[in-house]
Amino acid sequence: TASAFRDASADGAGGGGLGAALGEWIVSTDQPHAEISMLARARQLAIPATVHVAIGTDIVHMHPGVAGAAMGEATAIDFRLLAAVVCDLARGCWLNIGSAVVLPEVFLKVVNIARNLGQPLDGVTAINFDMMPHYRTSRNVLQRPVERGISLIGHHEINLPLFRVALLQRLQSSKKAGRDDS
């Protein structure tokens, strides 16, 4: 894992960001279960995937081969990429799945960037999936930055498949009705 992070940090610092570099590493090194990796699939479909490192919070950060400067640059590129994506989030949906600290802070910051750039964020819905309610997610994801916030408390192995089915059913019914609700 540390060698993957080392290589992806170095590659991602070159301009593509950490999420894209990790996805590329998974695909190019023919990792087991790459077919179910969100980072690998995002890379294959050219969909932005970002990784937001809080240095010192993961065991790979302590590995002597992982360069902090490269990791920092790669994750900074991802932060700017996410800010650009959120600038186009009007009438969209943000999912926070199981992150109680880092991603709520990142989301609040990129929303503020979008607003400071004059980007309209009307109609954004944020959904927080977690096992228990947390102050930071309730304030920084569901209340402060968006018009509509939904808290789904429960086990991910139950709620996420149910959410997926509900989303697919909604998309299918919209398609049948000739609407574009995507």
Roles of regions detected by a PLM:
Residues A46-P64, G68:
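Active-site rim beta-loop-alpha module in soluble metabolic enzymes
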Residues Q31, V53-A54, A69-C87:
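A general structural motif
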